[in-house]
Design a protein with these regions (language model features):
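...captures the hydrophobic TM-helix bundle architecture rather than a specific catalytic motif
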Residues: 1-196
């Protein structure tokens, strides 16, 4: 919430869609070009990611999801598939053009590292669970983290160790498509797993 309020205070709108709100591009460009306020956009975007990380159960905010599996199975299906855990992934995906075009690519780097650690940690913990629902919860955490890894690394140029927004249409599009495809397939099959 602090990141959203911080962002809207400096930009003047809650509408983050660059296609619908053409005035947002000029405001973000001016904000990124101002040396005194260059910290505002990366800070606001990272704070928004922290909020999404809590919803998507990223490490260290992952504790709530395995404990939520005590509920009825249809509730577990909704939490895993459609409503709660995919909110953070969708948030990062919808803000991806702002991350890339306006100099907040370093935050994508942090998102990728946090998500990669979460993916391996949750997968290892899932293998040690004796309760099937807790194992599925950690499996979901791992899969959500893989989606965020795809979004976080899709603009990283390994040739020179920096981000390159010129490759947005090809490489960035592939990472975005991989994350969104995995989001939909995971939602479909995890819901079927719980409900069938």
């Amino acid at each position: 919430l602090i990141g959203i309020l911080f962002f809207s205070f400096y930009v003047g709108t809650f509408n983050y869609d660059l296609n619908v709100n053409p005035g947002l591009v000029s405001k973000l460009t001016a904000l990124a070009a101002n040396p005194a306020l260059a910290w505002v956009l990366p800070t606001a975007l990272f704070l928004m990611f922290i909020g999404g990380a809590g919803k998507s159960a990223m490490f260290p905010l992952h504790i709530w999801l395995p404990d939520a599996m005590e509920g009825p199975t249809p509730v577990s299906a909704l939490i895993h598939a459609a409503t709660m855990v995919v909110a953070g992934v969708f948030q990062v995906a919808s803000l991806l053009p702002i991350y890339v075009q306006f100099g907040a690519q370093e935050q994508l780097h942090w998102i990728a590292w946090i998500a990669a650690f979460t993916a391996f940690y949750a997968a290892a913990v899932a293998c040690t669970q004796r309760d099937i629902k807790r194992g599925l919860a950690f499996s979901t955490i791992s899969q959500i983290a893989y989606m965020l890894v795809a979004l976080g690394v899709c603009f990283y140029d390994s040739r020179n160790g920096s981000f390159n927004s010129a490759e947005y249409l090809h490489h960035g599009g592939l990472g975005y498509m991989a994350a969104m495809f995995h989001l939909f397939t995971h939602a479909m099959f995890k819901a079927l797993l719980f409900l069938c």
